Swiss-Prot record:
Functional note: Catalyzes the methylthiolation of N6-(dimethylallyl)adenosine (i(6)A), leading to the formation of 2-methylthio-N6-(dimethylallyl)adenosine (ms(2)i(6)A) at position 37 in tRNAs that read codons beginning with uridine.
PANTHER family: CDK5 REGULATORY SUBUNIT-ASSOCIATED PROTEIN 1, MITOCHONDRIAL TRNA METHYLTHIOTRANSFERASE CDK5RAP1
Transmembrane segments: none
Gene3D superfamilies on file: Methylthiotransferase, N-terminal domain, tm_1862 like domain
Protein name as it appears in the record: tRNA-2-methylthio-N(6)-dimethylallyladenosine synthase
Organism name: Clostridium perfringens (strain 13 / Type A)
Enzyme class at the top of the EC tree: transferase
């Protein structure tokens, strides 16, 4: 399907909300448009196509989308040929697409999480027939391979290995909007990684809602540990990361693969969500506090230099002060290198939304602030331990905060900023850490 647009400049702008899975979906949307002659811009004023790729994990993300959609009304009035598309998880929710069209009738295209590959077709219909397109598929179809991808980085890339989730945690809407678990064939994954390496990529991150479930439903006999060992054999690849792991499915085989495979980075993102066994049961997480702490001990004993990061939800329905203190003490015991902390957000059609004992906002915010303070104190102490050490860093590009500096990450995920020549981008360099900051390290090149 070719896209036709009479405008001299064929520019598009994509705003992405949410997780790395959404980021990779946006890279595919961008790739499809670029393959049709469009160029990307960050300036909505000059774009002929504006896409919002949405998230619905928290209410805050939805409110941002509504606010930004409202701001496009004047742009559409100024430029009636502007095409506005909205897609992603938020649109997959029951009734959301109709709500958006009723509130923002100037939106041209709406689609969900299962049919992003059909975007060129929808765009063609809007441009050629002047119609409004809304198509939300209620059931996931097969995995579409071979879509063009416009990567954000020339050094590291996301590679999705599976889609969907079967876990149904009581607070989470993801299984309802992303569908059931589907794994890509390992040969397709390896082929994509080999192509990336041939283009000069040094690091890949394997993505999935729960990567440890990889392989279920495939004809070939392979699990996640087996896939990791296959990926480790790709010549020219320097580093491999993965996310996200569900603690209940992180097997001994995966731990041993991280230990034994030289390209697998010593970093595990292991969402705990709560340190209270009672709350974990209410969340339907299928593990308790003791199981999680035993798993952490096992990981640390097999992989001594490992960094552990996590996700934590504060203010889940029924959470008492005692439950919260359990979370604080677990964080102290584990000693996370960083944590993504969230205030519980009610989501329609999830079991937790119907639970009694919803926590008042002021208590949620107080606990959230106490947790962040406790975690940050620990992170500062852990970062201090790097001062004077020499670490290997993959140089990713200019630092976001200071473009005169370069930035990169250690094998175990620590962010390091340093002065150096831009020719080093994409290279592995040894840096001596001269100063630790709360959320990053400052290094100097070791000659």
């Amino acid at each position: 399907m070719t896209l036709e647009n009479n405008m001299d400049k064929k520019l598009f702008c994509i705003s992405t909300y949410g997780c790395q899975m959404n980021e990779e979906d946006s890279e595919k949307l961008s790739g499809m448009l670029k393959s049709q002659g469009y160029e990307r811009t960050e300036n909505k004023e000059e774009a002929s196509i504006i896409i919002f790729n949405t998230c619905c994990v928290r209410e805050n993300a939805e409110n941002k989308v509504f606010g930004n959609l409202g701001q496009l009304k004047q742009l559409k009035k100024k430029n009636p040929n502007l095409v506005i598309a909205i897609c992603g998880c938020m649109m997959q929710q029951v009734g959301m697409a109709d709500k958006v069209l009723k509130t923002f009738p100037y939106v041209d295209i709406i689609f969900g999480t299962h049919n992003a590959h059909k975007f060129p077709e929808y765009l063609h219909r809007v441009l050629q027939e002047g119609v409004q397109v809304k198509e939300i598929l209620n059931k996931e179809e097969g995995i579409v391979e071979g879509l063009p991808i416009d990567r954000k980085s020339d050094v590291k890339a996301f590679v999705t290995i599976m889609y969907g989730c079967n876990n149904f945690c009581t607070y989470c809407i993801v299984p309802y909007v992303r569908g059931r678990e589907r794994s890509r064939k390992s040969e397709d994954i390896i082929k994509e990684i080999e192509e990336l390496v041939s283009q000069g990529y040094k690091e890949i991150t394997l993505l999935g809602q729960n990567v440890n479930s990889y392989g279920k439903g495939l004809e070939e006999d392979i699990d996640f540990a087996g896939l990791l060992r296959k990926v480790n054999e790709v010549k020219g690849l320097e580093r491999v990361r993965f996310m996200t792991s569900h603690p209940k499915d992180l097997s001994d085989d995966v731990i041993m693969a991280i230990k034994e495979c030289d390209k697998l980075c010593e970093q595990v993102h292991l969402p705990v969500q709560s340190g209270s066994s009672r709350i974990l049961k209410e969340m339907n997480r299928h593990y308790d506090r003791e199981y999680y702490l035993d798993l952490v001990k096992k990981i640390k004993s097999e992989i001594p230099d490992v960094t552990l990061t996590t996700d934590i939800i504060i203010g889940f329905p029924g959470e008492t002060e005692e439950d919260f203190l359990d979370t604080l003490s677990l964080c102290e015991e584990v000693g996370y290198d960083s944590a993504f902390t969230f205030i519980y957000s009610r989501r329609n059609h999830t079991p937790a939304d119907k639970m009694e004992n919803q926590i008042p906002d002021d208590i949620k915010h107080d606990r959230f602030n106490r947790l962040v303070e406790a975690i940050n104190k620990k992170v500062v102490i852990k970062n201090k331990e790097y001062e004077g050490k020499v670490v290997e860093v993959l140089v990713e590009g200019p630092s976001k905060n200071d473009e005169t500096k370069l930035t990169g990450r250690t094998r175990n995920g620590k962010l390091v900023n340093f002065a150096g020549d831009e020719k080093l981008v994409g290279e592995l360099v040894n840096l001596k850490i001269v100063r630790a900051q709360p959320f990053s390290l400052i290094g100097e090149i070791v000659e």
